[in-house]
Amino acid sequence: ALALKDADLGIAMGNGTQATKAVAQIVLVDSKFSVLPGVLSEGRRIIANMERVSSLFLAKTTYAAVLVIVTALVGWRYPFLPRQFSYIDSLTIGIPAFFLALWPNPRRYVPGFLKRTLSLAMPTGVILAAAALTAFGIVDGPPQSRESTAAILSLMLGAIWLLVITSRPLSTWKWVLLASVISATVGGVLIAPVRHFFSMVAPTGHEWFVIACVGACAALLVEVAQRIFYARKFKRSLEG
């Protein structure tokens, strides 16, 4: 029991003494060590996938905060309605995060979870907020929903690229997930009932060009941020 107390991870057999099981972190109910690889895989999946999903949520928190601050300072109206935020969140965070969190991930635990997550999420959030504000400023109404639509789609293009980054390495099912997100994003604008529900309008040719340019720049900058900040932090964590 004393040895288990001092161990990094105490493992006790189910048929062991009560004192041993009381101090152990893991108790093998059937007293078989053969179940440990499965326990290890489950732990790795939870920790590694938490890092993936956290980047998506923290990036959203960052760009929402930046948008509030900037629009308040410059006197612009906020680019999005609450229902439009639901549209963005569902397609770039909620639905993809559900599948990413459940998928197996064999990557071993690497210290520095919070620093790595913030090193990707915070720069990305600033980039996505800048993309939304740029498109919002370039595209003119009326109606006002025209500006919001451009801001939504520009931000979502960058957010989808963040989803690509957090999904790496890409497998068949992840390509299917990404294709579904992109199809739903475009479909939400093209399908009239959905478009009207989220108070969006069909972009003109010029507006599609603006959206594509701003969104592509946002995606490129997100990739650069990942390589400069996150990849370096991850390498240092491995070396440390």
Where are these regions (language model features)?
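Acidic, divalent-metal-coordinating active-site segment for phosphoryl/phosphodiester hydrolysis
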Residues: A1-A7
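Membrane-embedded transport module
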Residues: N15-W173, V186-I191
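C-terminal transmembrane module of polytopic membrane proteins
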Residues: A135-G240
